[in-house]
Amino acid sequence: MKKYGLLLFLILSISCFSENKKSQQLQKDIVKSKITEEKNISEGNTNEIYKDRMKNFIREIRNDAEKNKYIITQNGNELYFRDGKLDRNFFPVTDGTTQESLYYGDVLKYNAVTKKESKDYMLSLLNPVRKEGKPVFVINYAKGNEKKDFLLKEDAKTGFVSELLPEFEARAIYNPIQGFNSENITNLKQVKNYLLLLNPEKFSDINQYFEYLKNTDFDLLLIEPSHNGVFLTKSQVEQLKTKKNGGKRIVISYLSIGEAEDYRGYWKKEWSKKWPKWIVKENPDWKGNYIVKYWNSEWKNVIKEYRGKLESIGVDGYLLDTVDSYYYFQEKMENGNKIPD
């Protein structure tokens, strides 16, 4: 028994040492990135500044999250590159990524085929990411069996996992492109289909929402875990990790980190009258969503506290949305507009 106890102690010690090394490396990468930013500013090279700030924010979330949490980015796949090559310092920070409207849903037009130029550019980012082993989940906005057949053929070539959503608001139920299965899904690379449901307003309350989710067989749930401010319980989330058919699956919570949302529990009434200094403007395409200075410490604390709630209900990880908000600031900088911190 003593031998087994000693062996277990050594295994746990090695595991803790490994995790500490990862944490220390993330901290080093953050410091290194900040030094690089200062150098770029002094030399007038501003192309990477706002991308690097988003990368650092994601690193901080990874460093602060519970062990084994999955982190998936939504769009913004330029983050995985530097100078035209994969950014080896950032690439391992996340576990998967998504891309909206790769094939259908171009410029927020439902059923519209994405222009070849846009599609080819997105593929130039996604193909290297996938070949390097990171799962890629493609979100298309269209309908029709012919489109489903097309996506199946494309996925066979690329290794992506695509779905066809019936609307942009991600509030409707749909059948997956690949059929359901009863396999145990223990990591993102095993996922063959997923449910993206970010707006559960069609359900009467959190319990009806939970009952629906519980009775599905999707491999992966990418969901909003609350309804009208009421969150799923830890027990409910744990039940959702089993498909209706008995197979295990993964439950990921939506988390927007580049925009503030006035319908979230963290939103304070006074912000509607006077914005905090870290809110820049309202997103013209999505009412109630506000572009933020995501590098601001106050905003980071807002996200940290909100993420604490998500941790407490036991989700398997986070779908980090609006990571591509760096585009807004980068464009401002390129046009000669100074952005105060």
What spans do the regions from the language model cover?
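Sec-dependent N-terminal signal peptides
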Residues: 6-8
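C-terminal motif of bacterial Sec signal peptides marking the signal peptidase cleavage site
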Residues: 14-15
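Positively charged n-region of N-terminal signal peptides that target proteins for export
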Residues: 1-4
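Glycan-processing catalytic domains of CAZymes
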Residues: 21-341
